[in-house]
Amino acid sequence: MSFSGKYQLQSQENFEAFMKAIGLPEELIQKGKDIKGVSEIVQNGKHFKFTITAGSKVIQNEFTVGEECELETMTGEKVKTVVQLEGDNKLVTTFKNIKSVTELNGDIITNTMTLGDIVFKRISKRI
């Protein structure tokens, strides 16, 4: 299954609690909570390029499944991690005590990030 495409955020759960837990300033949390960001994914075999645009903020991450990479987080911090592919529709990684699972089902992509007992879920639809 190919992840390639553009996806627009449809809904999210626990945005504010998760962003507070990772240390994002309140001002940025309030600015970001209603932005319907767009994610563009380009997949070439096991190589992925993610471009996430939320308002004026753009995050670009590139990685190859199973190889160590450096990813930029929502706070702008760069972390080293390894992204794994589970089945043919689920990307999984862990960094800084956060487990991130990105799952593709048809035209819907669900990103679930878990930090302790806080589960932040973003649901986006292919556009």
Curated annotation (Swiss-Prot):
Keywords: Acetylation, Cytoplasm, Lipid-binding, Phosphoprotein, Transport. The modification Phosphothreonine is found at T51. GO terms for molecular function: antioxidant activity; chromatin binding; fatty acid binding. The modification Phosphoserine is found at S11, S39, S56, S100. It comes from the Eukaryota. GO terms for cellular component: cytosol; extracellular exosome; nucleoplasm; nucleus; peroxisomal matrix. GO terms for biological process: cellular detoxification; cellular response to hydrogen peroxide; cellular response to hypoxia; fatty acid transport. Its main location: cytoplasm. Pfam families: Lipocalin_7. The modification N-acetylmethionine is found at M1. The modification N6-succinyllysine is found at K31, K36, K46, K57, K78, K90, K121. Coiled coil: none annotated. It is found in: Cytoplasm. Belongs to the calycin superfamily. Fatty-acid binding protein (FABP) family. Forms a beta-barrel structure that accommodates hydrophobic ligands in its interior. Plays a role in lipoprotein-mediated cholesterol uptake in hepatocytes. Binds cholesterol. Binds free fatty acids and their coenzyme A derivatives, bilirubin, and some other small molecules in the cytoplasm. May be involved in intracellular lipid transport. This is Fatty acid-binding protein, liver.
